Structure formats: structure tokens, C-alpha cells
């Protein structure tokens, strides 16, 4: 099952991915209801959809919200209960029986490399975090060609996301001698590459 947003689906960005899955002898299904901040209603719908289609693998295709939605769905397929109870620690995480692949289409969230997810309870206006060794993707595929579909301003915005994470890591109270040089290096790399989309956008004006 591929998890993505409606815009990604409507633009046909999944076509080559779906063709690749079919060429491997698999029949893909698509849950294209991913929304910003991964609302719990969307996650619940995705869980139901995945169970109805008896999926054995999930592919997250999109930005951080699609990643978080896919992570939450993957974690909940083998347990009974609700995603909010899972986030609150009322449901014990267990090793997933399904495979989780992550293909990011932005360059800033880093969600494809972490075992942490965030979902939004819009009714309570509260974001829940879930984090455990089974929440992270089994495989992450980074294809720079996918970034060509983004506008320079969107690339810059998502790169600023990466810069912000690095700045937080450097300035937080838990920073240590191992973390600080890595955070500084990450900020330097982010700053260097932020200039490229900015210059490209200026040249188009």
C-alpha cells in the first residue's frame, strides 16, 4: 500500500513507482488521504483501508506528514486499539509484521530516518508523539530527481526545516560533545545548499 497526499496522487507522481511495484509481481493499492500534521482521523481511515486490503508492505511517498501517517498505520496493523492510546503508551508496541518503505519527496523533515512519528488530534487541538524501535522505516529511498517537482521556495522551506532541527539540537539543554559538532556541520551544509534554490528562483524573476 502506498501512502501519499491527494495532490501527489492527482499530479501522477506515483505512476513510475506503481509501475515498478507491478513489475515486481505485486499489486499495489493507494491510500491518498494523507493530510498535513497526520490527523488521527486520517490515520484511522488508513488503518481500516490497509486491513481491508490485507497489505504486507507500506510505502510512504511524500513529505513528513505522509511519513508520519504511514508510520502510524504500519505500527497499528498488528495491535488492537486506537492510535491515541498507542501514543499514550496504553498499548505496548510490538515488532511489525509488515515492511515499511519511505520515499521522501521533500528535503527537510528527515522523517524517513527516524523511529518517531507525530499525529494530530484536531478535536483536542493536541499533537501526540509515538516513538519506539518499530516505528522507523525498514528502507529509505532518497531520489534527488523527485525534488525537481518542487518549487525553489518549497525546497528552501523544507531545507529550513532541516536547519531548524540542527539549531534545536545545538541549543537544547541535552546537547553534548558528540551532538554539538554534528549539529554545527548540519547547519553549515543546510545553509550552503539553501542558497542554490534561492539563486535559481531569483534567476526566474
Predicted feature residues:
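Conserved beta-strand elements of the Class I
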Residues: 1-2, 57-59, 101
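Cofactor-binding loop segments of dinucleotide-utilizing enzymes, especially the Rossmann-like FAD-
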Residues: 4-5, 33, 103-105
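Generic structural signal for well-ordered, non-membrane alpha-helical segments
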Residues: 10, 14, 39-43, 51, ...
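Conserved small/polar residues in nucleotide/adenosyl-binding loops
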Residues: 192-199
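A glycine/threonine-rich phosphate-anchoring loop and its flanking beta-alpha core
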Residues: 78-177, 181
Amino acid at each position: 500500500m502506498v501512502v501519499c497526499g491527494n495532490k501527489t496522487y492527482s499530479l501522477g507522481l506515483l505512476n513510475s513507482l506503481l509501475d515498478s511495484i507491478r513489475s515486481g509481481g505485486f499489486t499495489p493499492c493507494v491510500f491518498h488521504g494523507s493530510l498535513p500534521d497526520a490527523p488521527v482521523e486520517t490515520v484511522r481511515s488508513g488503518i481500516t483501508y490497509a486491513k481491508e486490503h490485507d497489505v504486507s508492505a507500506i510505502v510512504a511517498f511524500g513529505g513528513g506528514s505522509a511519513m508520519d501517517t504511514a508510520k502510524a498505520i504500519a505500527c497499528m496493523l498488528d495491535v488492537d486499539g486506537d492510535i491515541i492510546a498507542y501514543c499514550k503508551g496504553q498499548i505496548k508496541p510490538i515488532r511489525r509484521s509488515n515492511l515499511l518503505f519511505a520515499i521522501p519527496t521533500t528535503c527537510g523533515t528527515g522523517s524517513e530516518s527516524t523511529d518517531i512519528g507525530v499525529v494530530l488530534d484536531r478535536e483536542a487541538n493536541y499533537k501526540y508523539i509515538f516513538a519506539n524501535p518499530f516505528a522507523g522505516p525498514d528502507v529509505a529511498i532518497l531520489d534527488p530527481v523527485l525534488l525537481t517537482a518542487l518549487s525553489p521556495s518549497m525546497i528552501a522551506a523544507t531545507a529550513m526545516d532541516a536547519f531548524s532541527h540542527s539549531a534545536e539540537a545545538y541549543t537544547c539543554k541535552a546537547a553534548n560533545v558528540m551532538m554539538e559538532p554534528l549539529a554545527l556541520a548540519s547547519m553549515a551544509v543546510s545553509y550552503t545548499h539553501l542558497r542554490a534554490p534561492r539563486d535559481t528562483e531569483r534567476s526566474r524573476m
